[in-house]
């Protein structure tokens, strides 16, 4: 780039500028010494760790899925009722896939006609962000038939009757959900009619090889050893550059053994403490009467704290337009729920859970540390609108949570708990409406009996 002096300055001004440069002291002409590196604070470490952890939870699950035999662009239909992952939704038939797309190949999806039953096909990116749902709510003019999920701006020729959906990611996690309802066999029949196939021959991505840590045991400084690989997946949310820069700076700094030890200590003190502090309200959520409701789920914007907590406690959560979750962990006295004790939860007749869901509601009890369902001899892990519920004379509904069925309580109103286990309740509203959808509703207090 050339730089020209304005003509109005004339030769005198030009001569003055040149002379001034030539007469500058030698010290000014030399390159100044580099500024000292900015110290990485404990808060920097905590922010970077929480951000990175959200991605590592996804890559851990991806590696485990492929280790278990999953293949790219293949939809796997799971047997209903499986409970071997955190916070399972026991009211749907799941199908799962990992999808790879590129500029020349989309993923084609066949959706059967589903009547009077909840269903959706959810697509998430490598950070746990929901990019799309296929259902009659999102596509009322094309609720079933042929769909194609394509990389944005991909040049792909598709059949005329295909609904194209553009997404900003090459790697996608897919979950298809079909409500079980009263007729599980019909739900399974519909589940197996969902199909998936690539439109061409996509260049499949490599499964990222990042740290795999056990269960809910969080890693320490070793998380940053996977930073370079983890950050290769674009984060679609704006404003993440600063925290990503922190992640990269820490990943470089821990090459020094002393700094590595300091970062590890900081993670185990401040980062873990920050996570523990945020967990009761699920990040930036709201707590009331022993229940917590997250501020956002499924799509997170700049709220990476909530994203990480959701990925940790119930990965692949959908958007609040589809489902709203409440987590109950304390009784009316502020004490944690104990599987040895007995509790009750009464919904007033004018606020029955069925009145606040377009599709269905359910409540599940899970271990407070592992997030797995509580084992019991009945293999009963949830209560929902399909249970044989008995209502009180005033129209209210009382549910009971206890290791053995309380006297004079209908069997359908009782959810068994496990003695000695601290647990939480997860209340789901699918197709939320009314005060649940607006955020004004909170469940009643849980009473210790």
Model-assigned labels for residue ranges:
Residues 30-449:
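A compositional/structural signature for long, glycine/proline-rich flexible linkers
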Residues 4, 23, 30-34:
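Selective for proline/serine-rich intrinsically disordered segments
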Residues 1-16:
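Bacterial N-terminal signal peptides that target proteins for export
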């Amino acid at each position: 780039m050339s730089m020209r002096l304005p003509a109005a300055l004339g030769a005198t001004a030009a001569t003055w500028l040149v002379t001034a440069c030539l007469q500058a002291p030698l010290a000014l002409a030399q390159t100044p010494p580099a500024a000292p590196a900015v110290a990485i604070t404990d808060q920097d470490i905590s922010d970077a760790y929480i951000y990175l952890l959200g991605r590592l939870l996804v890559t851990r699950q991806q590696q485990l899925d492929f280790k278990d035999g999953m293949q790219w662009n293949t939809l796997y239909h799971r047997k209903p009722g499986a409970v071997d992952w955190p916070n399972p939704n026991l009211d749907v038939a799941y199908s799962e896939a990992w999808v790879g797309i590129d500029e020349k190949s989309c993923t084609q999806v066949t959706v059967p006609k589903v009547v009077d039953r909840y269903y959706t096909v959810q697509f998430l990116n490598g950070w746990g962000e929901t990019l799309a749902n296929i259902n009659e709510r999102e596509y009322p003019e094309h609720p079933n038939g042929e769909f194609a999920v394509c990389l944005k701006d991909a040049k792909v020729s598709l059949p005329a009757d295909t609904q194209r959906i553009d997404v900003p990611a090459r790697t996608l996690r897919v979950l298809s959900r079909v409500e079980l309802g009263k007729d599980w066999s019909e739900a399974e029949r519909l589940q197996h009619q969902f199909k998936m196939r690539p439109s061409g021959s996509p260049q499949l991505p490599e499964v990222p090889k990042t740290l795999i840590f056990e269960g809910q045991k969080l890693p320490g400084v070793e998380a940053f050893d996977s930073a370079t690989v983890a950050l290769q997946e674009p984060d679609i949310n704006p404003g993440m550059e600063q925290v990503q820069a922190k992640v990269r700076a820490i990943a470089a700094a821990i090459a020094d053994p002393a700094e590595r030890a300091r970062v590890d200590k900081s993670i185990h003190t401040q980062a873990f403490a920050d996570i523990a502090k945020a967990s009761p309200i699920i990040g930036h959520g709201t707590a009331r009467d022993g229940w917590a409701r997250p501020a956002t789920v499924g799509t997170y914007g700049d709220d990476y704290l909530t994203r990480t907590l959701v990925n940790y406690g119930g990965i692949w959560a959908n958007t609040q337009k589809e489902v709203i979750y409440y987590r109950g962990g304390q009784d009316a006295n502020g004490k944690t729920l104990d599987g040895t004790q007995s509790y009750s939860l009464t919904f007033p007749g004018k606020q029955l859970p069925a009145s606040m869901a377009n599709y269905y509601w359910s409540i599940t009890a899970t271990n407070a540390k592992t997030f797995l369902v509580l084992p019991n001899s009945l293999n009963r892990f949830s209560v929902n609108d399909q249970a044989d519920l008995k209502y009180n004379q005033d129209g209210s509904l009382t549910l009971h949570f206890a290791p053995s069925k309380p006297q004079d309580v209908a069997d359908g109103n009782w959810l068994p708990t496990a003695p000695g286990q601290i647990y939480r309740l997860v209340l789901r509203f699918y197709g939320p409406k009314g005060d649940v959808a607006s955020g004004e509703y909170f469940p009643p207090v849980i009473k210790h009996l």
